[in-house]
Design a protein with these regions (language model features):
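N-terminal cap/lid segment of alpha/beta-hydrolase-fold proteins
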Residues: 1-37
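Short, surface-exposed "cap/lid" segments of acyl-processing enzymes
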Residues: 35-76
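Active-site nucleophile loop of the alpha/beta-hydrolase fold
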Residues: 47-48, 141-149, 168
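Alpha/beta-hydrolase active-site loop
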Residues: 89-109
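Gly/Ala-rich beta-loop-alpha elbow adjacent to hydrolase catalytic centers
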Residues: 118-127
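Short beta-strand/loop motif that positions the catalytic acidic residue
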Residues: 158-160, 165-167, 171
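Short alpha-helix in the alpha/beta-hydrolase fold that links the catalytic acid
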Residues: 175-184
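Catalytic histidine-centered segment of alpha/beta-hydrolase-like enzymes
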Residues: 198-207
Length: 223
């Protein structure tokens, strides 16, 4: 599909496209809710590019599916160097630019739509960094890795909107207590949902994850 197509997907349709990013084209999947005009837009960021992260990740898919169910147009995309996206890994700096490029494209299509920024693991950190410029209506962070891959990195600013954080107490990749300490330092802290026994990848718990996300979206988005 041509880069920067201005055609949004029809209701119930999923469409592949390419958005021009800072380092080249970014492979993007747009999905539209089945009924009516979108109530908003949701941009979902995937896990670490150097450890197999991609927009096909099942937690990323679960985030996007929850947003679709809430009536949002959803966008998943591959960071630079992943899948058909151009460029090379850039330690969250370039990836934040990638997220903002997709956000800017979405904003041009739907200038007034409320924005939900969401991400899993590395993608949760990148989406929180992007919030300073994108100014979302809602922020969702799943297993956000403060300091895990990001040595000497300062936590990003508070997104300035209702914020939901989800984390498993037995996360084998991103330590729960370390993340909790950082989250509790924010003013106000995010709403935190602690999972038990879900690990980092929420194996067998994705439906529970979605059941947690959907009420948050429905509560805070305009009817």
């Amino acid at each position: 599909m041509p880069s920067n197509s201005t055609d949004l997907p029809a209701p119930g349709e999923t469409r592949q496209m390419f958005v021009d990013g800072p380092a080249g084209r970014l492979e993007t999947l747009l999905a539209a809710p089945r009924q009516g005009a979108p109530a908003g837009i949701c941009l979902v960021c995937h896990p670490h590019p150097l450890y197999g992260g991609a927009m096909s990740n099942k937690v990323v898919y679960a985030l996007a599916s929850s947003a679709l169910q809430a009536g949002l147009l959803t966008a998943r995309f591959n960071f630079r160097g992943v899948g058909q996206s151009e460029g090379v890994y850039d330690q969250t700096r370039g990836e934040t630019g990638d997220a903002l490029a997709v956000y800017a494209w979405l904003r041009r299509q739907l200038p007034q739509a409320p924005l939900v920024l969401a991400g899993f693991s590395f993608g949760a950190y990148v989406s929180l960094k992007a919030a300073a410029e994108a100014r979302p209506a809602l922020q969702i962070s799943v297993s956000i890795p403060f300091g895990k891959y990001l040595e000497n990195a300062e936590p990003p600013p508070h997104p300035g909107c209702p914020w939901l954080a989800l984390h498993s107490a037995d996360d084998e990749v991103v330590n729960y207590d370390d993340t909790l300490a950082v989250l509790q330092a924010y003013v106000p802290p995010p709403q935190l949902v602690r999972f038990e026994g879900a690990g980092h990848f929420y194996h067998g718990r994705l439906s529970e994850l979605q059941q947690t996300l959907l009420p948050f979206l429905q509560q805070h988005l305009p009817a």
